[in-house]
Amino acid sequence: MDSDEGYNYEFDDEEEEEEEEEECSVDSGEEEAVDDSLELGEVELLDPAVAGGEPDDCADTGGGGPGPGQEDEDYRFEVLTTEQILQHMVECIRDVNEVIQNPATITRILLSHFNWDKEKLMERYFDGNLDKLFSECHVINPSKKPKTRPMSTRSSSQDLPCQICYLNYPNSYFTGLECGHKFCMQCWGDYLTTKIIEEGMGQTISCPAHNCDILVDDNTVMRLITDSKVKLKYQHLITNSFVECNRLLKWCPAPDCHHVVKVQYPDAKPVRCKCGRQFCFNCGENWHDPVKCKWLRKWIKKCDDDSETSNWIAANTKECPKCHVTIEKDGGCNHMVCRNQNCKAEFCWVCLGPWEPHGSAWYNCNRYNEDDAKAARDAQERSRAALQRYLFYCNRYMNHMQSLRFEHKLYAQVKQKMEEMQQHNMSWIEVQFLKKAVDVLCQCRSTLMFTYVFAFYLKKNNQSIIFENNQADLENATEVLSGYLERDISQDSLQDIKQKVQDKYRYCESRRRVLLQHVHEGYEKDLWEYIED
């Protein structure tokens, strides 16, 4: 395929030193020999709004801690833009190409096939079976590219039909891959745009010919697509593959944020993006200390499955005493027949006992003392008790989540109060206690919210009682602090406000620290036992 002037990996020994200072990219499928230097020709195509939301100066290249109020300040990370991720990709491709000496876009496809694991690629590359390797990666071996057949005088001078749209075009309007299948430029552009925009495909776009699995290289894509938005989307798809395969990289989960967080080692630790979103690097959810990722994932799934219907189920259904399928009573008759095709049990709605002993007295159930009916009712009660337990923790979890949303709005109110205080002979530094108090309040709300997830899966023991006492103490102090900031801030004198708020937020900080330290100590000493849901 002809090379492109744009999104291109150029290799040139004479310009190696100059190229090292320029931005780099991912390239073509050129047949020329590959040298040492690597250049990204179209980094300028990346719109900051798409690439990362901010220009390069927004990247936290010096690393960072988890943010205010968090305990682990040794977990280093940096926030990267899409341009910087692209440069990391180019460096990875350059490292491999120093050894295998292939066109850069071919190397990119090989690396993608091995999930960007350079060691695995090298091992396979030198195991002596290159033909099999390139076949598995769906590319033509660059050292064995088929010779291009010369066009006859007749075919080169006459219009030819495209095998997709069947319109006639001059031969110069056709292009294709090393597999030899050629189509018109318009069909190529439409095909690639559909694959990228509608199907979300980037690294696995194959030749449009029937039963041809040869992959389209980056240079071909960037040459044949004219819409800059489609090019940006393609670049994002390629970089997404690189990020998803790298255990040290994670996309920021905030909507419309295209930053990537890079860490020195993967762990369930808090990281903060430049957009302000703080999340757990391990699972990508909002930072959720003290509950572990495993239990939070189970909780989120349970809430998604249960929260909207649990109240209705509790009030309107019972379980089949045989197969435990949930059954709704749709008539006045108490003679129930389970509609589970593998069950078909007949039972009494009132006592949940077998229907057969009821005889003709279906309207006047007298089986309450039967052992089998009692066992069925016991099972039903256990199910209801489990549901009530879930609702207990879910309601408190959701309540703290809602309070946290409201208290984020306190910042505007507090800012206004801080300005008023500065007009009453208080310095800017002296009024910072109010912002600090709101910070602590939000941290405590977040911690309390996740303590209910932790408690839901926690088995009762002596340590769990201590945990619940710490939880209750922190919850009470948090509510008092919330009251100070929402009501007393506009009523009390300035000195009274300052003393009350400072004392309470320091106490909240202390109790939050005690609670988290106790939970972490339990993790270290294996003190916690869990209820498998």
UniProtKB/Swiss-Prot annotation:
UniProt keywords, alphabetically: Coiled coil, Cytoplasm, Metal-binding, Repeat, Transferase, Ubl conjugation pathway, Zinc, Zinc-finger
Zinc finger (IBR-type): 232-293
Region: Disordered, residue numbers: 1-35, 48-73
Domain of life: Eukaryota
TRIAD supradomain: annotated span: 158-369
Gene Ontology molecular function: any one: zinc ion binding
GO biological-process terms attached to the record: protein ubiquitination; ubiquitin-dependent protein catabolic process
Residues involved in Zn(2+) 3 binding: C252, C257, C273, C275
Residue sites binding Zn(2+) 1 per the record: C162, C165, C184, C187
Cystine bridges: none
Entry binding sites for Zn(2+) 5: C320, C323, C338, C343
InterPro entries linked to this entry: Ariadne, ARIH1-like_UBL, E3_UB_ligase_RBR, IBR_dom, TRIAD_supradom, Znf_RING, Znf_RING/FYVE/PHD
SUPFAM superfamilies: RING/U-box
Zinc finger (RING-type): 162-212, 320-351
An annotated GO cellular component: ubiquitin ligase complex
EC code(s) of this entry: 2.3.2.31
Top-level EC class: transferase
Segments forming a coiled coil: 409-425
Subcellular location: Cytoplasm
Residues the entry annotates as binding Zn(2+) 2: C179, H181, C207, C212
Pathway: Protein modification; protein ubiquitination
Residue sites binding Zn(2+) 4 per the record: C280, C283, H288, C293
Entry domain remark: Members of the RBR family are atypical E3 ligases. They interact with the E2 conjugating enzyme UBE2L3 and function like HECT-type E3 enzymes: they bind E2s via the first RING-type zinc finger, but require an obligate trans-thiolation step during the ubiquitin transfer, requiring a conserved active site Cys residue in the second RING-type zinc finger. The active site probably forms a thioester intermediate with ubiquitin taken from the active-site cysteine of the E2 before ultimately transferring it to a Lys residue on the substrate.
Functional description taken from the UniProt entry: E3 ubiquitin-protein ligase, which catalyzes polyubiquitination of target proteins together with ubiquitin-conjugating enzyme E2 ube2l3.
Protein name: E3 ubiquitin-protein ligase arih1l
Classification lineage: Eukaryota, Metazoa, Chordata, Craniata, Vertebrata
Gene name as annotated: arih1l
